[in-house]
């Protein structure tokens, strides 16, 4: 019996020994890795965000500086003449000239400007036609007939015939027996008016006159 107790005590002691080993094994903490200096990865540098450069503002260009035209010529002076005062006495003398057949057709050519300046020859021509209106001796070629005859020569109604030969040619075309050819000559400030009455058939000068024209 003592032998059995000893065996039981030995088994019990061995069991206690094993349980203590197991307990120590279970209580050991898990190994912890220590951080070693110098092994950390370097931080990646932050890439700069690219920026778009701003476009500089272009300043508004000033407009061209306007200068008054220094080369422009002054407007020509407008002159007014007493055409009627010069023409009435001359027309009266022409109507009394020798060799003029009453009732004949008369072509009044435009007054030609032969002065050294600019004057309104159209105004002079109109005044001359008015001075001859209802003269009792000549029948005037109408302005419409004269305009048509000028157009046949390639001229405008306002154009002067410019020469005696052209005036005579148109007079024949319109059936006129006489032509009154007139020129303004000399200084434009104090022009002279020359008038010639010509016979279309022969070109003979039946009458001529000259008078001074004053400015108004």
Swiss-Prot record:
Primary gene name: lpoB
Oligomer and partners: Interacts with PBP1b.
InterPro entries: LpoB
Location in or out of the cell: Cell outer membrane
Protein name as it appears in the record: Penicillin-binding protein activator LpoB
GO BP terms in the entry: peptidoglycan biosynthetic process; regulation of cell shape
Source organism (scientific name): Enterobacter sp. (strain 638)
Described function: Regulator of peptidoglycan synthesis that is essential for the function of penicillin-binding protein 1B (PBP1b).
Protein family (similarity comment): Belongs to the LpoB family.
Membrane protein topology class: Lipid-anchor
GO molecular function: enzyme regulator activity
Disulfide bonds: none
Region (Disordered), start-end ranges: 28-77
Keyword Mitochondrion: no
Annotated lipid attachment (N-palmitoyl cysteine): 21
């Amino acid at each position: 019996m003592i032998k059995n107790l000893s065996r039981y005590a030995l088994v019990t002691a061995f069991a206690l020994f094993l349980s203590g080993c197991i307990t120590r094994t279970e209580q050991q903490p898990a190994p912890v890795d220590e951080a070693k200096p110098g092994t950390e990865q370097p931080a990646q540098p932050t890439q700069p965000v690219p920026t778009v450069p701003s476009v500089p503002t272009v300043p508004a260009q000033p407009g061209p500086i306007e200068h008054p035209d220094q080369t422009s010529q002054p407007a020509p002076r407008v002159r007014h003449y007493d055409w009627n005062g010069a023409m009435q006495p001359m027309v009266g003398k022409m109507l009394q000239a020798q060799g003029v057949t009453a009732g004949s057709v008369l072509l009044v050519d435009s007054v030609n400007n032969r002065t050294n300046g600019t004057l309104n020859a159209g105004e002079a021509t109109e005044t001359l036609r008015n001075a001859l209106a209802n003269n009792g001796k000549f029948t005037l070629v109408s302005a419409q007939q004269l305009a048509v005859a000028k157009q046949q020569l390639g001229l405008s109604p306002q154009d002067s015939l410019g020469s005696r030969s052209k005036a005579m040619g148109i007079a024949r075309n319109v059936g006129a027996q006489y032509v009154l050819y007139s020129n303004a000559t000399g200084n434009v400030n104090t022009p002279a008016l020359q008038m010639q009455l010509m016979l279309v058939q022969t070109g003979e000068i039946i009458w001529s006159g000259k008078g001074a024209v004053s400015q108004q």
